[in-house]
Each structure stands twice: as structure tokens, then as C-alpha cells.
Amino acid sequence: MAWQHKDLLGLRGLAKQEIELILDTAAPMKDIIGRDIKKVPTLRGKSIVCLFYEASTRTRTSFELAGKFMSADTVNIAAASSSVVKGESLIDTGKTLDAMGTDIIVIRHAASGAPHLLAKHVKARVVNAGDGAHEHPTQGLLDLYTIKERKGRLEGLTVTILGDVLHSRVARSNIWGLRTMGAEVRLCGPSTLLPPELAITGVKVFTRIEEALEGADVVNVLRLQLERQKKGLFPTIREYARQFGLNQERLKRCKSDVLVLHPGPMNRGVEIADDVADADFAAIEEQVTNGVAVRMAILYLMMGGSGSGAVH
């Protein structure tokens, strides 16, 4: 099976077989990362531009390494050091990159829908690296990959997403991906940080952490996105940690083989305790490694690849 879309803008609307294609392709990519010489000629001669209008460490570096491991020419553009500061529009920036022969544009933007707008106006393939509070599809995919790698399956699992769901594009991509793959999804957080419209997606919504964790196979912990919040959504950070922070005692309500995820960056002692973040049942560093593999798979498939040809 080959990738049938020009762009990857979100997980909402992707078929189960399309998600499986990406996850299956990521496995041999992870083998490449484990080699002493992390280089294959798969995308030699192809150009990838990472266009980031928001700060990023993990996602931007992950995409850059993913391209370089497959021999693509990878360029990073920070909006603060580009013509954006001179008033250039997103569409004009995209057309400029098109004119330079760019094959793939990886974009992160504060405005929901920005990657969709860009994709309509450029010939280059577009990958959404996070748009506002809308979606973060590659993070969702790497979370799915990590769960499947640890648990052996996705279907039938109970996954609790805990924290600031209202402002989280990661939560939305996880919801769509997990639901498509047959998992039960629970959301938990203060009522002020739980968007009511997500209840219609078929997920279960909780405001008591003890109920949300009962029998969970996986807990995906979200950080408080204070940079996106208005005041008054919860009393204090200390109070939030007391009511919704994930600690060892609360984890006793989960399955004995529970898996803990966190998309990073972590606020230790707020949404997650140190002894949880550093435990063997947490796969937080694995998520970072798997992120490179999943993004390699996406870039490879979007450039027409299929099968295991990328590993040679």
C-alpha cells in the first residue's frame, strides 16, 4: 500500500489502514536509528524545509534528523529570522519556498488551520507539525507507535488523557488516532480545561482523576499550557498538582502493567511526579526516539516510498 495523500494535516479522517501503514513503516526506520552509521540514501536529492512560527525543540530537531538520516537536504527556518518579520504572508512564504524547489514543507503555526491554508496554495507536500490547539498529527502517531510497541496492540486498550485538554493539539490527534484504531479514550482534567465539544467524539470525560484512572492501560499526561491560557481556569498551580498531578499512589488504580506517556516538555512536580516520569513503566524517552522513526516513515511515504526499501 502506498500513501494516497499529498499532505499530512491531521489524523481526523485518516483510515485505519493509513495509520497502520505509517506505524508499520516506522519499525524499519527505527532500525536505522539504532545503527552506528545512521544514514541511508532514500531521499537523496529531496529538499525539506521546517518552517516554524512557534518555538520547538523536540519536533523541529526530530524532523531535521529524520530528513538527514535519509540523506535529504533539510533547512530550518524560524519565523523570527525570516521575511515574516517584514510582513510577508504565510502564502507568499510558501510560494517562495515552492519557487526554490522545496519538496516538503513541515510547518508549525500558532493559528489553527494554517497548514491547511498553506497546502492549498503550494505544490510542495505539507506536514502539520502542530497548529494552534487543533492537531499535532506526528505526535499522535508517535504516541500510537509507542503504545503498540509496548503493548503489542491498540485495539481494546483503555487510554486516559490527563491534564490541559482544552489547549492541547496533542490530545486531539491522540483522540482521533486512538478512536480509529479501536481504543477506548478517557479525558480527565478540571472542567475549565475540558472542551465540551470533545464529548461528541465518543470519549468519556471525567473531572475526578481517581475515576479516570480506574483500570487504565495507558495514561498520557499533558502539561499545563500556561502560554495559551487565560487567567482563572484553575486556582493555582499547586492546587492543580494536588488534584490532578499523576503520582505513584494514584497509579495504583490503573492496570498493573500501566504505560505512562508525556509529549514533553514536562513540568515535574506539577502534572507528573519525578518517580513516575523516571520509572520503567514510563516511555517518555522512547517517545522521543520513536518520534524520529515515525517522522522518517512519514517523509518517506509522502515522497512515494513503500515497503521496506528505505532501510537499504
Curated annotation (Swiss-Prot):
L-aspartate binds at residues 86, 169, 223. It catalyses: carbamoyl phosphate + L-aspartate = N-carbamoyl-L-aspartate + phosphate + H(+). The keyword Nucleotidyltransferase does not apply. Gene3D superfamilies: Aspartate/ornithine carbamoyltransferase. Pfam families: OTCace, OTCace_N. HAMAP family: Asp_carb_tr (MF_00001). Belongs to the aspartate/ornithine carbamoyltransferase superfamily. ATCase family. This is Aspartate carbamoyltransferase catalytic subunit.
